[in-house]
Amino acid sequence: MTQRTLRGTNRRRIRVSGFRARMRTATGRQVLRRRRAKGRYRLAVS
Protein backbone atom coordinates (compact mmCIF):
# COMPACT_ATOMS: atom_id res chain seq x y z
CA MET A 1 0.00 0.00 0.00
CA THR A 2 1.32 3.47 -0.87
CA GLN A 3 1.85 6.08 1.80
CA ARG A 4 1.05 9.77 1.71
CA THR A 5 4.48 11.37 1.65
CA LEU A 6 3.41 14.99 1.81
CA ARG A 7 1.34 16.06 4.79
CA GLY A 8 0.90 19.79 4.99
CA THR A 9 0.17 21.53 8.28
CA ASN A 10 -2.04 24.58 8.40
CA ARG A 11 -0.02 26.30 11.11
CA ARG A 12 3.13 26.23 9.00
CA ARG A 13 1.13 27.27 5.93
CA ILE A 14 -0.06 30.41 7.73
CA ARG A 15 3.31 31.15 9.30
CA VAL A 16 5.15 30.88 6.02
CA SER A 17 2.72 32.32 3.50
CA GLY A 18 0.00 34.09 5.49
CA PHE A 19 -0.81 37.78 5.17
CA ARG A 20 1.09 38.86 8.28
CA ALA A 21 4.12 36.83 7.23
CA ARG A 22 4.08 38.65 3.88
CA MET A 23 3.76 42.05 5.54
CA ARG A 24 6.77 41.32 7.75
CA THR A 25 9.38 41.53 4.97
CA ALA A 26 10.02 43.95 2.13
CA THR A 27 9.88 41.19 -0.49
CA GLY A 28 6.68 39.86 1.06
CA ARG A 29 5.12 43.29 0.63
CA GLN A 30 6.25 43.25 -3.00
CA VAL A 31 4.42 39.94 -3.43
CA LEU A 32 1.22 41.50 -2.04
CA ARG A 33 1.67 44.56 -4.26
CA ARG A 34 2.03 42.36 -7.36
CA ARG A 35 -1.01 40.31 -6.44
CA ARG A 36 -3.09 43.46 -5.83
CA ALA A 37 -1.99 44.86 -9.20
CA LYS A 38 -2.94 41.60 -10.88
CA GLY A 39 -6.34 41.74 -9.21
CA ARG A 40 -6.13 38.53 -7.21
CA TYR A 41 -9.19 37.69 -5.13
CA ARG A 42 -6.94 36.20 -2.43
CA LEU A 43 -3.75 38.08 -1.66
CA ALA A 44 -2.37 35.56 0.80
CA VAL A 45 -3.18 32.27 2.47
CA SER A 46 -5.07 33.11 5.65
Swiss-Prot record:
GO molecular function per UniProt: structural constituent of ribosome
Please cite one Gene Ontology biological process associated with this protein.
translation
Spell out the GO cellular component terms annotated for this protein, sorted alphabetically and separated by semicolons.
ribonucleoprotein complex; ribosome
InterPro entries assigned: Ribosomal_bL34 (IPR000271)
Q: Which Pfam families match?
A: Ribosomal_L34 (PF00468)
Q: Write the record's keywords in alphabetical order, separated by commas.
A: Ribonucleoprotein, Ribosomal protein
Transmembrane region positions? none
The family line of this record is:
Belongs to the bacterial ribosomal protein bL34 family.
Q: What is this protein called?
A: Large ribosomal subunit protein bL34
